[in-house]
């Protein structure tokens, strides 16, 4: 068995006394379709085994007592009854001796779902799955909060399949899963297909960029589950006049992104159309601590399942920060890749393979333009398993804007690395190709933006590099949370400048981890052999100065020699200028503390690189500089009696006591801080780790797991709090952790969103401010259009929410079908069967291209196509005309000759002169 195939004996786990090797053997069917990572939790015990005598799984066998007593009539009746109810029991939960949340069988899932889980090779549920699946099966509205890669997708897909079971003959979708991006929707579709194998459930994926006619056909096939992006789903809802009254189960995947800028209008339209008795789930890697504003989503008595407060970052993640100057960031990136990570350069074989893939991508693009050409099939390489690294040094580089992405990829390719890239406005086909190269190990570096990285399926990584520090702590967690998964170790390197220090201090407070400079570490640990803790502290320092200078000179020469790099560098600088204007500001307290951190040697030699050889030289220069008395320009080479010298002496006499008192105050504050006698920011950091979980006042309107468990045991009503949920104002300020998770109303989400990923370009930026309305004669909000409801289509354009183009009406008339009647039974007439079974006509003819016209713009391109067609034999050289006549040609020529004879033998009408007519009858007629 290969490493990519995992075998798990569920029958043996449920009943250790029965050998289940004959039942089935689970293995990974396709490693190319990897769902959202379902990690094995290391801190959980294995699945608890059932008591002897329980039935095996998945074959419905009798217990040991029934098998031994074959003559017992009662046993035969039981066996007959079980045989009759085999279908129902197969879709029901297995009868285990004791329910255990340590295994999927103990969560109440049916045997068919368990079989599909085992076939994919998953053994134990993750914490988010253990806590949410039983609640969802009970019909509760759940808000799930867990970091990226914790198995959130399976947490809502498995109970959905358990509830739907089989296809419904009634018209109307019963489950809807909304995703913020096409990539995430495709990933969710793969998971649903894997776990629904063996059922007759119908799926439909509705995303932008696909054919509307094909999606009309999908919706007319009465799907049970719809996986869609909000833009296209609302487009089809308006165009087809869909009714969502049949929806029983709706899930908002990556809910914080769905309810932010891009999909706010679409979500409000969709939520108003959903029935009130639906079950609503919200899942995301980052959700706010207070979820009162999400009441607009229609949650009824929701239960909050939050795991990120327990471990905000992966357990084995090591982090460090490199302090650089303004013009040293590129040199630091090259230094990290070459010296720290030791990234190998691209081999000649890799470069040839990448060139071949580029040529194939160009050919595919030309075939898309010329749809008559048939696309050749290439054998795709299988993706590695979820627990295996794409390559040994696989690294993601996060950039702030797409302009930085374009600059960095050219820079790294010039250095000799194999690089892939993805940003928000990249074409969907190009995204797939770039991600496929990175997943298969053909490239070792993936350069992305935050907007593009959300929803990208990269299970395991070795390193993460932040080209610039993100302004939000949660964006930082989302970035670095992609490494050190599934018990693996990983590194996160961040490049920061002096203006990033306030954001770094906000991150320090949010994570509850102490910022450690080289100077502070040496004061706390006099032992020179001591190593810093990169897991529990935020270690900062500067890379070796000499190495940075070498890489900086090399890159400067590269940029000087390349016109493309010069242009991209200028565009990236302008893009960063706009990015800094739009990103949020750090807290005032962090801005004040940043000066203290800079005074503590934040840019000293980094502890990772051992002793600093430059420090001794700097100390010597400092001592030499102190040998002479420092003089100002007013005193240099002037006598003491001049006015300037007297003024400086008076000023020094006045400032000396003030400077002395300030130095004494700083020394006292430092002693108090070390003694723990003051409530400083450090005390807030220490206290924030104890206040991660939400209090009762913070989670007003939400039920926690502990409350639900206590209510089931005691069967008593919970004592009502004296605090009014609407008017109560707390007497203490929220902690920094609360501020990080806080969210305002949706009207102000553009500026106060808790996890607002700044767009990597200006294409999706909304207008801000006021503009003059000529008709109204006053200023109005630039983002409003007179109160009309608009939606943003998949192309980015704003259209009216009630707009119908009539394409569905034309499609219905062409296929002779009617509207969907939600709630009615499916039609099985000939018209419906014809529509569902009809195949889309595709041009398969490989005709010769037209002759190239030198006056057209595509002359050279068409000339190349004609030359290729001649080589393929589609265009043949003209042959000489045959002189042999066929029987039909001979007969035709004889008939024509006979007609000429008859015409020439007619008598003339004229007189003399041969019938030339007129007077005289010819030449001599006079």
From Swiss-Prot:
Alphabetically list the UniProt keywords.
ATP-binding, Helicase, Hydrolase, Nucleotide-binding, Nucleus, Ribosome biogenesis, RNA-binding, rRNA processing
Q: What is its main location?
A: nucleus
InterPro entries given in the database record: DBP10_C, DDX54/DBP10_DEAD-box_helicase, DEAD/DEAH_box_helicase_dom, DEAD_box_RNA_helicase, Helicase_ATP-bd, Helicase_C-like, P-loop_NTPase, RNA_helicase_DEAD_Q_motif
Q: Which GO terms describe its cellular component?
A: nucleolus; preribosome, large subunit precursor
Q: Which CDD domains match?
A: DEADc_DDX54 (cd17959), SF2_C_DEAD (cd18787)
Q: Where is the Helicase ATP-binding domain?
A: 133-305
Segments of skewed composition (Gly residues) = 910-926
**For this chain's UniProt record, which GO biological process terms are given?**
assembly of large subunit precursor of preribosome; maturation of 5.8S rRNA from tricistronic rRNA transcript (SSU-rRNA, 5.8S rRNA, LSU-rRNA); maturation of LSU-rRNA from tricistronic rRNA transcript (SSU-rRNA, 5.8S rRNA, LSU-rRNA); rRNA processing
Localization, UniProt: Nucleus, Nucleolus
Keyword check for rRNA processing:
yes
In Swiss-Prot or TrEMBL terms, this protein is called: ATP-dependent RNA helicase DBP10
């Amino acid at each position: 068995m290969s490493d990519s195939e995992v075998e798990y004996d569920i029958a043996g786990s449920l009943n250790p006394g029965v050998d289940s090797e004959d039942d089935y053997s689970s293995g990974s069917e396709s490693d190319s379709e990897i769902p959202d990572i379902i990690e094995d939790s290391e801190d959980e015990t294995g699945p608890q085994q059932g008591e002897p005598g329980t039935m095996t799984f998945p074959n419905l066998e009798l217990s040991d007592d029934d098998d031994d007593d074959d003559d017992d009539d009662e046993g035969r009746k039981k066996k007959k009854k079980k045989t009759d109810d085999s279908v129902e029991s197969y879709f029901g939960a297995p009868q285990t001796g004791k329910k255990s949340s340590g295994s999927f069988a103990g969560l109440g899932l049916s045997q068919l779902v368990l079989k599909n889980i085992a076939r994919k090779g998953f053994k134990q549920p993750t914490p988010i799955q253990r806590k949410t699946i039983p609640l969802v099966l009970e019909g509760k509205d759940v808000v799930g909060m867990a970091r990226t890669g914790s198995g959130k997708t399976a947490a809502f897909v498995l109970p959905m399949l358990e509830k739907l079971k089989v296809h419904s003959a009634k018209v109307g979708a019963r489950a809807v899963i909304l995703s913020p991006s096409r990539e995430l929707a495709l990933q969710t579709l793969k998971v649903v297909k894997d776990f629904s194998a063996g059922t007759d459930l119908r799926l439909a994926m509705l995303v932008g960029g696909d054919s509307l006619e094909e999606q009309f056909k999908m919706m007319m096939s009465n799907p049970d589950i719809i996986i869609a992006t909000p833009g296209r789903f609302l487009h089809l809802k308006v165009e087809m006049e869909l009714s969502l009254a049949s929806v029983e189960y709706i899930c908002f995947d990556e809910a914080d992104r769905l309810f932010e800028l891009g999909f706010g209008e679409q979500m409000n339209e969709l939520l108003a159309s959903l029935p009130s008795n639906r079950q609503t789930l919200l899942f995301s890697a980052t959700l706010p601590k207070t979820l009162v504003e999400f009441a607009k989503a229609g949650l009824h008595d929701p239960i909050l399942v939050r795991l990120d407060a327990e471990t905000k970052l992966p357990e084995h993640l090591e982090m460090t920060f490199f302090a650089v100057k303004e013009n040293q960031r590129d040199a630091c990136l090259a230094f990290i890749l070459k010296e720290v990570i030791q990234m190998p350069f691209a081999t000649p074989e890799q470069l040839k393979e990448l060139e071949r893939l580029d040529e194939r991508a160009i050919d595919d693009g030309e075939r898309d333009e010329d749809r008559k050409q048939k696309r050749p099939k290439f054998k795709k390489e299988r993706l590695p398993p979820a627990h295996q690294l794409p390559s040994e040094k696989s690294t993601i580089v996060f950039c702030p804007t797409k302009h930085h992405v374009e600059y960095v990829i050219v820079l790294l390719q010039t250095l000799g690395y194999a690089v892939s890239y993805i940003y928000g406005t990249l074409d969907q086909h190009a995204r797939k190709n770039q991600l496929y190269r990175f997943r298969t190990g053909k490239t070792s570096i993936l350069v992305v933006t935050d907007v593009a990285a959300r929803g990208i399926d990269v299970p395991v990584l070795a390193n993460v590099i932040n080209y610039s520090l993100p302004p939000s702590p949660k964006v930082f967690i989302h970035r670095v949370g992609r490494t050190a998964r599934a018990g693996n170790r990983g590194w996160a390197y961040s490049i920061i400048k002096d203006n990033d220090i306030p954001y770094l201090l906000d991150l320090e407070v949010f994570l509850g981890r102490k910022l450690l400079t080289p100077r502070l570490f040496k004061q706390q640990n006099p032992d020179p052999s001591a190593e810093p803790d990169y897991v529990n502290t935020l270690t900062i320092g500067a890379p070796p100065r000499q190495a940075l200078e070498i890489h900086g000179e090399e890159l400067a020469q590269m940029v000087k020699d390349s016109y493309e790099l010069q242009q991209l560098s200028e565009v990236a600088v302008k893009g960063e200028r706009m990015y800094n204007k739009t990103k949020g500001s750090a807290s005032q307290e962090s801005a004040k503390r940043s000066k203290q951190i800079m005074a503590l040697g934040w840019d000293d030699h980094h502890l990772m690189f051992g002793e600093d050889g430059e420090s001794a030289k700097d100390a010597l220069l400092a001592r030499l500089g102190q040998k002479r008395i420092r003089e100002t320009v007013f005193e240099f080479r002037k006598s003491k009696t001049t006015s300037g010298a007297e003024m400086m002496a008076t000023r020094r006499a006045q400032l000396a006591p003030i400077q002395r008192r300030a130095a004494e105050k700083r020394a006292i504050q430092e002693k108090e801080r070390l003694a723990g006698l003051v409530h400083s920011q450090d005390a807030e950091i220490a206290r924030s780790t104890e206040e991660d979980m939400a209090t009762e006042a913070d989670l007003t309107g939400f039920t926690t797991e502990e409350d639900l468990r206590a209510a089931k045991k005691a069967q008593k009503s919970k004592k009502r709090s004296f605090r009014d949920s609407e008017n109560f104002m707390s007497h203490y300020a929220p902690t920094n952790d609360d501020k990080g998770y806080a969210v305002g109303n949706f009207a102000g989400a553009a500026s106060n969103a808790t996890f607002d990923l700044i767009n990597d370009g200006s294409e999706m930026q909304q207008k801000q401010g006021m503009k003059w309305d000529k008709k109204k004669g006053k200023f109005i909000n630039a983002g409003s259009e007179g109160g009309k409801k608009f939606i943003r289509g998949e192309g980015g354009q704003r259209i009216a929410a009630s707009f119908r183009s009539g394409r569905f009406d034309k499609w219905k008339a062409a296929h002779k079908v009617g509207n969907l009647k939600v709630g009615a039974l499916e039609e099985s007439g000939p018209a419906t069967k014809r529509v569902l079974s009809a195949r889309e006509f595709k041009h398969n003819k490989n005709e010769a291209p037209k002759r190239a016209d030198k006056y057209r713009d595509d002359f050279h391109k068409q000339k190349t196509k004609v030359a290729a067609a001649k080589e393929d034999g589609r265009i043949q050289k003209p042959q000489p005309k045959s002189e042999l006549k066929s029987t039909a040609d001979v007969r035709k020529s004889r008939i024509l000759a006979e007609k000429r004879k008859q015409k020439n033998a007619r008598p003339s009408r004229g007189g003399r002169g041969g019938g030339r007519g007129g007077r005289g009858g010819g030449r001599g007629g006079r």
